[in-house]
A protein has these predicted regions:
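Single conserved hydrophobic/aromatic residue that forms the stacking wall/gate
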Residues: 2-13
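Loop/helix-junction capping segments adjacent to catalytic residues or to phosphate/diphosphate-binding pockets
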Residues: 12, 20-23, 47-48, 80-81, ...
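Rossmann-fold NAD(P)-binding glycine/threonine-rich loop
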Residues: 16-37, 48, 53-56
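Short, ordered loop/turn segments at secondary-structure junctions
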Residues: 17-20, 42-44, 74-76
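Rossmann-fold dehydrogenase core element
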Residues: 26-44, 61-71
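Rossmann-like NAD(P)H-binding beta-loop-alpha module
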Residues: 49-66, 82
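C-terminal substrate-binding/catalytic lobe of Rossmann-fold NAD(P)-dependent oxidoreductases
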Residues: 65-190
Length: 190
């Protein structure tokens, strides 16, 4: 990164928890000192599209209070955080658009050995986000709206890491010609 800085290039970051620790400082540096940073919890083009669909569906579901929403994310056994940064970003997209939900809560966690801890029981204004750790799964995110009559389910299933790599390259190219605090919503304006 020192080489990038010495050449005046911006940074492209994907690191869980990093923005919680450094987000305000990075936004300030971009705004006040002309720095450039492209940050995302997930660089996959498919996840960017899925996120837009997720937000739109949440807006629609405001008109249908008999549907309750939940999420399950599945990742490889080496992933340490639960829920994933992508799941948190998707949950925040729902909370921004679905008036009856005010916060997400950790649901169940299925460990690599099959042990399940936690619960999906929560207050009516909360949305459970559950996590499964199994095999070498790159990432699956499923959002479910459930009623007594039926279910509406949307899923993004990463088959490999190619989509993440493509998105990171597109973000780097975008950063070369744009300034400030940037993200996937700047790169893809759905």
């Amino acid at each position: 990164r020192d080489v990038e800085r010495s050449r005046g290039l911006g940074d492209v970051y994907k690191r869980q928890g990093w923005m919680g620790e450094h987000g305000e400082e990075m936004r300030r540096l971009c705004a006040e000192e002309g720095k450039t940073l492209f940050w995302s919890s997930n660089f996959s083009l498919g996840v960017a599209i899925f996120s837009a669909v997720n937000k739109y569906l949440a807006k629609i579901m405001n008109n249908f209070p008999n549907y309750d929403v939940s999420m399950v994310e599945t990742h490889h056994i080496h992933k340490l955080d639960a829920p994933s940064g992508t799941a948190i970003t998707l949950a925040e997209g729902i909370l921004e658009n679905l008036d009856r939900k005010n916060k997400w809560v950790m649901g169940t966690l299925t460990a690599p050995d099959g042990t399940v801890t936690g619960t999906t029981a929560c207050a009516s204004d909360e949305m459970p986000v559950s996590a499964i750790r199994e095999g070498e799964v790159p990432g699956i995110h499923t959002i479910r709206y459930e009623s007594e009559a039926d279910s509406i389910i949307i899923t993004h299933d990463a088959k490999n890491r190619k989509g993440f790599a493509l998105g990171a390259v597109l973000a780097a190219e975008y950063t070369a010609t744009h300034e400030g605090f940037l993200g996937m919503n700047d790169l893809f304006q759905f």
